[in-house]
């Protein structure tokens, strides 16, 4: 009996579950960790990079993609599913520009992606998208935005959030450390994203991918050297803090 609900996308189980949607959410939990931070004049996306094969082109393995000049997205889950969603969202961004002669708001394109995902939970012959996405950008009035969508088609606005394999650990770190002081400058917001990822990424900066959008500026993907420099600064700050604590205890 349970198998019938297990296979059917559009049929609720007696206790109110849509199993295929829940399985899609499990696929997200197996994906690379991604984190989003909303600063005052900046939005930051960081992703845990999986180590690539020796002969593989590194630039072809990207988890952060631009949807428009002022909006970008990071995802956790099935890369092939994400490609479909990204392509559809890019077409919608361009279509909106041509029709309305204005760029999309971040909420508009998030709602479009969430609606697309929701449609795939209610249609026969399809399966839900196995991805969760963090969507960041600036509205044309200069307001920074961060949204998260999941396979069920729900979306919410956040100050900071994480998705993927170790989302719970990273989210707990952000809940403790996200303050106005922690995002006082652009550099502080970037460092907070790196610190959050370093909670779960063991091999330091070389396994982190970072993208930033500043107000009235296009998307910028940070170079590995820039990330390594910031990681070194963070490590130095940690050592100094530990030293101060030692001195306090001894006094």
Swiss-Prot record:
In Gene Ontology terms, what is a biological process of this protein?
ubiquitin-dependent protein catabolic process
For this record, an example GO cellular component is:
nucleus
Task: Supply the InterPro entries for this chain.
Answer: Ntn_hydrolases_N, Proteasome_alpha, Proteasome_alpha-type, Proteasome_asu_N, Proteasome_sua/b
Q: Which Gene3D superfamilies match?
A: Glutamine Phosphoribosylpyrophosphate, subunit 1, domain 1
Q: What function does the entry list?
A: The proteasome is a multicatalytic proteinase complex which is characterized by its ability to cleave peptides with Arg, Phe, Tyr, Leu, and Glu adjacent to the leaving group at neutral or slightly basic pH. The proteasome has an ATP-dependent proteolytic activity.
Subunit annotation? The 26S proteasome consists of a 20S proteasome core and two 19S regulatory subunits. The 20S proteasome core is composed of 28 subunits that are arranged in four stacked rings, resulting in a barrel-shaped structure. The two end rings are each formed by seven alpha subunits, and the two central rings are each formed by seven beta subunits. The catalytic chamber with the active sites is on the inside of the barrel.
What name does this protein carry? Proteasome subunit alpha type-7
Name of encoding gene: psma7
